[in-house]
């Protein structure tokens, strides 16, 4: 390198050094504190370029949040986290279907809320090789097959220490039966009772017998007069219920009243009069009514006493053989179908009706052919012959048409010699007449 070039380079360095002095080292520790947060390392403070501190300067102190973070980093068994498994950590992002569905948003009207109807998703947990299929209704559910907890609660939880009696073995209490609860899940109060049941009590602490069960309180002893029972015949009054009855007399040692004759029960129609010398319960008319035309028989009663005539037979008429002209009774509810219909409308095995018959069997009283001109097959002079005598018989024969011939283009046929000159037609016998149908 040439000497002048070296001199120019050294001169340039000096100019730049004089123009921009070094201020980095001078402003390095101008902060009122000795050091910032980046110089804190655990409990020690790393000082660089230490100098005499100002009057109110002090070392930054660690806060409660810093202690909580340091304590959470330690792996101590007796300091667990609430709602967190020490070996399973919650994954912040889902691998499958991470965004909420639209119908969930419309139903909840909240952007990121996932309630009981959330959809399934795959989660990964450190320490577990396989993926856990999370499909539980609650946010902090468990897998049904692996029984692995989903993770810690998303909200922040404060640290807590185990109680002092956690290390002691707890006594296992026997399974108890659920107590009956009242309103608002409160205990139902029970009346105090002795531990040993009495001689007259059953297993349910109730007194034996229907009398004691009806009473709330146990029976108490009372004074009873000699000769008066507690519940005897004198307790009830005589007579029927609902009617005024005399007061009953006390049952004592005295003699009972003499027995009277049994009461005679009369028929309903004879309650106002004297009883008749006839057997009980035999009556001619129901409830003692009068004999009327439908109930009584015609004529006087038979003079000779005897049994009553059977129902529907006369006692004065003897039994005779059946008469030949007697009409046989038939079933009134039977359905006889066609043979009981009107004779005028139904005709069995009859021929066809003529064209001019007023009854066309349609239950309409109109003529079959009111106007003959409406039919093209009937000539104009046909109505003139309708007034003559009609002859019942078969329909008149229609003249047979001639067979068609295989005509050529020149108009001659292929038939015999009598058809060579062309197709000939026989003269018509007369006008066509419509016959009976």
Swiss-Prot record:
Name the residue ranges with Low complexity bias. 371-382
User: Where is the segment annotated Disordered?
Assistant: 1-31, 77-437
Q: List the disulfide bonds.
A: none
Residue ranges under compositional bias (Basic residues)? 1-29, 81-91, 101-118, 133-142, 165-190, 284-293, 324-348
Q: Which organism is it from?
A: Haloferax lucentense (strain DSM 14919 / JCM 9276 / NCIMB 13854 / Aa 2.2) (Haloferax alicantei)
Q: What is this protein called?
A: Uncharacterized 50.6 kDa protein in the 5'region of gyrA and gyrB
| Compositionally biased region (Basic and acidic residues) | 119-132, 143-164, 198-209, 217-253
């Amino acid at each position: 390198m040439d000497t002048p070039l070296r001199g120019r380079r050294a001169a340039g360095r000096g100019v730049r050094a004089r123009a921009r002095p070094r201020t980095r080292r001078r402003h390095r520790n101008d902060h009122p504190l000795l050091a910032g947060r980046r110089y804190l390392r655990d409990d020690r403070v790393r000082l660089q370029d230490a100098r005499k501190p100002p009057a109110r300067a002090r070392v930054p102190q660690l806060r409660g949040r810093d202690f909580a973070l340091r304590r959470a980093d330690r792996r101590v068994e007796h300091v667990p986290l609430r709602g967190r498994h020490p070996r399973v950590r919650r994954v912040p992002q889902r691998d499958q279907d991470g965004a909420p569905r639209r119908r969930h948003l419309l139903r909840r009207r909240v952007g990121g809320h996932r309630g009981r109807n959330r959809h399934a998703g795959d989660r990964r947990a450190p320490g577990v090789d396989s993926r856990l299929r999370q499909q539980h209704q609650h946010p902090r559910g468990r897998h049904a097959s692996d029984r692995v907890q989903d993770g810690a609660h998303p909200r922040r939880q404060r640290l807590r220490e185990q109680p002092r009696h956690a290390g002691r073995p707890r006594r296992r209490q026997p399974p108890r039966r659920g107590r009956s609860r009242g309103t608002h899940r409160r205990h139902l109060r029970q009346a105090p009772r002795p531990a040993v049941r009495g001689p007259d009590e059953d297993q349910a602490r109730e007194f034996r017998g229907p009398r004691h069960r009806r009473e709330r309180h146990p029976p108490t002893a009372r004074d009873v007069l000699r000769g008066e029972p507690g519940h005897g015949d004198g307790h009830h009054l005589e007579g029927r219920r609902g009617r005024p009855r005399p007061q009953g007399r006390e049952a004592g040692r005295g003699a009972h009243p003499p027995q009277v004759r049994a009461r005679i029960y009369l028929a309903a129609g004879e309650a106002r009069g004297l009883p008749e010398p006839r057997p009980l319960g035999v009556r001619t008319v129901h409830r003692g009514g009068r004999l009327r035309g439908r109930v009584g028989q015609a004529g006087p009663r038979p003079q000779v006493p005897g049994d009553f005539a059977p129902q529907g037979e006369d006692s004065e008429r003897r039994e005779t053989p059946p008469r030949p002209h007697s009409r046989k009774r038939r079933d009134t509810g039977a359905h006889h179908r066609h043979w009981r219909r009107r004779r005028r409308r139904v005709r069995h095995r009859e021929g066809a009706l003529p064209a001019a018959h007023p009854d066309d069997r349609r239950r309409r009283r109109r003529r079959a052919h009111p106007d003959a001109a409406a039919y093209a097959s009937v000539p104009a002079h046909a109505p003139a012959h309708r007034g003559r005598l009609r002859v019942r018989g078969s329909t008149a024969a229609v003249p047979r048409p001639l067979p068609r011939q295989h005509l050529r283009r020149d108009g001659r046929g292929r038939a015999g010699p009598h058809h060579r000159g062309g197709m000939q037609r026989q003269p018509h016998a007369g006008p066509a007449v419509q016959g009976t149908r």
